Every structure is written in structure tokens, then in C-alpha cells.
Amino acid sequence: SSGIKVYLENLLDALQKLDSENTYFLFSPSPISYKLKNENFNLVITPSKLPGILWQQYELPHYVKDYKIDVFWGPEQTIFLKKLSGVKKVLTVHDFAYRRYPKTMKRSVRTITEHYGSRSILRSDALVCVSDFTAKELSHFFSGIAKDKIHVIDNGIISSIEKETESKEDFLLFTGSLEPRKNLKTLLRALEILKEKGFSPRLKIAGPAGWKNKSFRAALENSSIRDSVEILGFLSKEKLEHLYATAKAFVFPSLYEGFGLPVLEALNAKTRVFTSENSPMQEILGKLGIYFSPESEISLANSLEKLYLNSTLSFYTEKELEKRREILEKYSWENTAKRMLSVFESCARPKS
């Protein structure tokens, strides 16, 4: 997914700046666009006719053995289940949407994640959770896992701490894929409520068309605010940054997230964030976020109404900007990479 791509590429960039001693091999069944920069980082293409998950389970272990890998890292919820002598396994666990909100996922994805993801968790030597929230979810669903196996290592962001505040335009922004879990129908209904109250909300949606997006598009087609909503599709990094910076506010009504990177991207752009009160968003933003119940269009409409009644809410106060700095300094890819490297090295070390 696009979120995993951002996670993996940024973490690889940061690891390459940090570590010139250990040797890394990146295995892929097909060519990738990402370019490695260091001599100690190697891309190994292993052409395969198998679907990704079957390549991972049945072909990848042979390469891991041939290349004499000490520590194998699975960055996306699953890992090969075969036990290889001398190989330690590290797994990143992003979220448990497949258990909490199964109906918001394709059945095939849900089945694969449930079958292989659960077994991957049980067969890993170290588990990296992207937030405290995900670590709590892991302990809830897998209560038998030893606490010392679980490491909370937050995602990062390439921050622009000194960024100037840009002039705000009269639109709300949502970024992410158009799929049921992102809860865009509730956002649509909230904006309809605001229109009934005499406000003129405009919304821009940036992101790829996800699974089951037709139902949202049908709701939009029949909506009283359809002419005020723009679906922009997948955008370049530069265009997305410009949208983040010029939006009146960023709205993120997602039902469930393991981390919630878009809220951090909006904060980085000095844009006010309205977000679901669930999952880890409060963990990231603290008092800087404006929260609502994602299950209720009335709660969301009431939150957004504050913005239309008080336009200065689009801008952070000096005190809030100080807090923003602290948050962005905490969530850096450099910190993420340092802590990941520490997990890799402790797994590679022989137990005394």
C-alpha cells in the first residue's frame, strides 16, 4: 500500500545515513523504483511467477538461507513462517484493522493477513509496533507474547520545523485512499449539515481510489454539496505538500489507524487538524488536535462549525507552535532508524 511504501522508503533512507557497517539485502520478486544509495545496501531481484504472499512463504526462505542472513525484517505485517536455523526474525506490526473492522477490508486481504499475519506474530523474535496504541492492541489479541519481545518504534516524518505559515485558502483537505475505513461518507454527511446551517464548506480529497470506493462516489453524486467536493486522485509529493500548507484545515475521520501519518503531515504543514478521537491520533497530537467521534456526523459537524465561526482557528498560537516543534522533533525518521538498528543488532547478538 502507499502507506507501507512511505514507511519503508523513508526508513531505508535513514538507515543508509546511519549505518555503513552492517550489510543489508533487500529482496523483491520484481523490479522496484526505489534506488539504494550505499554500497552496503544491496537489491536482490528474485523473479517469481507466484503471487507476493506465496513468493514470501515458499521462495524467499531459500534466498535468505543462501545469502546467510542473520536477521530478517518483515516491514509489512507478515513474514515467512519457515524456521531457518540461525536466522532471527523481526516483524513490523502496523495495525489490527483486519480484526477490529473486518468489513472495511477486501476478504482476500483480510484472510491472508489473519492467516499469515497471526502466525508471523507468533513466530517472530522481535515485534516492532508503530505506536503505543498498536502495542496495546497486540497485547490484547496475543496476550501470551512476552513483553520484552515488543518494541514501540514510532513512524517518522521529514519535518519542516521552521516552515513559514502559508496563506490559507477556503477549503478542507482529506488525504488517503478512498475506502470504507477512511469513513468519508460520514464526512460528507457532516458537510451537508454545515450547508443546512448556512455555511459553504469546500472539500478536496487527495489519494488513490481504494477498495469499495464506488459507494462513496454514489453518495457524493446524490449529495447536496457534490459541486463543492473535488476528488484529485493520487498526487505528487510537491502538490500534496502545497495542499497541506494552504488548506483551511485538515480533516481525518478514519475509523481506525495504527499510526495516522497524515495528521503528522498536516501538523508539519502548520495546518489545523480535525481528527477521530480513536486510535493513536491523540497519542501523536495531544492538545493540538480537535477531536470528534468518527461514528457521528453530528459530532464532526459540530467540531468543524467552530472553524467556520472563528477563522483564526486555522492558525496555531505561539504556544501551540512550540508544542508542534516538540512533536516534530520526536517523530523523526532518524530516531526511528536508530531504534530499529538497535533491535536488529540485539537480535543478531548471540545470547550470553
Predicted regions and their residues:
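Carbohydrate transferase catalytic cores enriched for Leloir-type hexosyltransferases
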Residues: 1-352
